[in-house]
Design a protein with these regions (language model features):
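C-terminal compact regulatory domains
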Residues: 1-130
Length: 130
């Protein structure tokens, strides 16, 4: 699997990258919401399977970045799964994530087994080739 990730904390980004790579996945890390929006604008089918989005980031937060991805010109933005990964763990925070267009809300520190289960739920499996 290939992930496009937004994480402004360098240590958290490194840990996330190591966890994903240990599971055979790859990821591209963007340090703020504006950079992930810009990166997503040129994404083509098959480039990424899912977005992992921090909420509290400089320049543009994850909620606004999600809104822009969902409403942007790239049609993949309407369907790609976006998972919030954030220290904001209250019910109100989860509701804000959903309202912004996120599919799921995971609290930090992220439990790798919880992340795996969530990814499995939202993974889009391509149809078998004929």
């Amino acid at each position: 699997m290939k992930f496009l990730c937004a994480e402004d904390n360098a240590i958290n980004a490194e840990i996330l990258e190591m966890l994903l790579e240990a599971k055979g996945a790859s990821c591209t890390i963007c340090p703020n919401g504006q950079e992930i929006v810009d990166a997503f604008a040129s994404v083509k089918p098959g480039d990424y399977d899912m977005i992992l989005m921090d909420i509290q980031m400089p320049v543009m937060d994850g909620l606004e970045a999600t809104r822009r991805i969902r409403s942007g010109e790239n049609p993949l933005g309407r369907t790609i799964p976006i998972l919030a990964m954030t220290a904001n763990a209250f019910l109100e925070d989860m509701q804000k994530s959903k309202e912004a267009g996120m599919d799921e809300h995971l609290s930090k520190p992220v439990d790798i087994s919880a992340l795996e289960q969530t990814v499995k739920r939202f993974r889009v499996t391509p149809p078998p080739r004929k």
